Amino acid sequence: MTASSRGSSAATASREHIGYENGVLGGVSSAVQALTAPGEKILVHSPTYVGFTHTMADNGRVLVHSPLVRDENGVWRMDYADMDAKLKRHHIHLAILCSPHNPCGRVWERWELERAMEVYAANDCLVISDEIWSDIIMPGHKHIPTQSVSADARERTMAFYAPSKTFSLAGLIGSYHIIYNTYLRDRVVRQSEVSHYNDCNVLSLHALLGAYSPAGEEWADEMCRVIDANHEYACNFIRDNFKGVRVMRPEGTYMLYLDCADWCRKHGVTIRELQERG
């Protein structure tokens, strides 16, 4: 892999560590079913990708949210004390980490991931790391695979990737996991097999190979530069024309996360009403 290996831990993986999934959400669902029981709680950061919300509800699991917080520079950060408290209070042993984070666009720095993994390890919590956005990284930032930050993280984490976001291949179906821990890998693979849907198709396989070629990497690099310019334009436009709406320029992904709380207070509307007007 070329385009993928710059953003994933594939460069250090052997053949047996990599497995096919029809989609990242499908792989996440298989891991959740393999490692938890209905009614168990799973830790996620909020704001939360709506796909996690729906998938966990469909599987009968309960999400516990640890809200991201802004630092003094307006950068969204994980709240490690809150994570630790909720893992302990709710006896949680499985967490989902979105890296880069959707929807706020954070590309977690190594120290942030190291500290998060220390919290998970201290609470005997396994980690599902959704890294589907790892190739859409803006200039000046670098994706750090969760599994790369420590020996414990390598064994504790199940990482999921796909070319679908980067190369608009979602309609063809196809993603993959990287799981180094043999026990965890066997559990996830077995759960994926019993679903009877997790079979690779030839068209998506060749699309992935084409995407993860030198030409695909060149295309992805150019796309990231275009997205970065679009981010700059959009953020400037929002700040100039929508007073009270806060926006942080994304470090990764093509998502813009708008904080409309001040705007809503000023105009006497709720977030729900604003969504309905949209």
Spell out what each predicted region is.
Residues 2, 6-278:
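PLP-dependent class I/II
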